[in-house]
Regions:
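Short S/T/G/P-rich N-terminal loop/turn motif that feeds into the first structured element of a domain
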Residues: 1-74, 82-97
């Protein structure tokens, strides 16, 4: 079952987001799903919110997210955001272009 996950990063900005992406992709950047080391991502959006930065994603399954978390979790921790707890909900409907 697909899931929707939201990461809120209080006090963070685009600089942290860009640093995480650079580390997770070995500096290649993230412009297509193939740039990520783990499969299963359906959609990704990120941007500033009051007091921080938010990332919202749709994953094919919780297992796919958990596999990817093993890659980006340590990066977030290394960059000072070990306490990030995502909000995860089951997706009722996912429409992609």
């Amino acid at each position: 079952m697909a899931i929707i996950v939201t990461f809120d990063l209080p006090g963070a900005g685009q600089e942290l987001y860009d640093a995480v992406i650079a580390r997770v992709t070995d500096g290649r950047g993230f412009t297509q799903f193939a740039d990520l080391p783990n499969p299963g991502l359906v959609s990704h959006a990120a941007g500033p919110v009051d007091g921080g930065f938010r990332v919202t994603e749709v994953w094919e399954s919780l297992e796919a997210l958990e596999t990817h978390a093993k890659t980006f979790g340590p990066v977030l921790a290394d960059l000072g955001h070990a306490d990030v707890q995502p909000t995860i909900i089951p997706a009722h409907n996912v429409v992609v272009r």
